[in-house]
């Protein structure tokens, strides 16, 4: 009887150890907004100092215009963090966006239109900035975040921001 009881306890412990771990809780839009702003600020490079991250659209401070310039609509996004230059002297923009339900393609199309516009703006103007715009990265991360990086050294900036978001 003792052996049977010990065996039952051992099997229970063994099987409970094999159970899958619960998935990490989904972050709220507010938590994602904070995460995106911090990831871009910490890893976005020098240009973030001159172009602070915005995370809400307001008419009075130009952030609504910046969203429009980036091809984004507030209703297409559940959360976002964006740093971009409103002056057309450098090809620069970083956007981390959690699309609203069913809006991933709209977000990606908007950001791709921003990339295309920047390429066109710099094609005959500043060759080095045209190269930056042409090398922009736009991808959807494992957690559903759409990340666009157009900046000097975009690959390392993209990887750093991506890592910060996925580990956040």
Where are these regions (language model features)?
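Positively charged n-region of N-terminal signal peptides that target proteins for export
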Residues: 1-4, 8
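C-terminal motif of bacterial Sec signal peptides marking the signal peptidase cleavage site
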Residues: 13-17
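Short, compositionally biased low-complexity segments enriched in polar/charged residues
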Residues: 53-90, 106-107
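A short, solvent-exposed beta-edge/loop patch
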Residues: 86, 96, 129-168
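A short acidic-to-branched-hydrophobic micro-motif
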Residues: 91-101
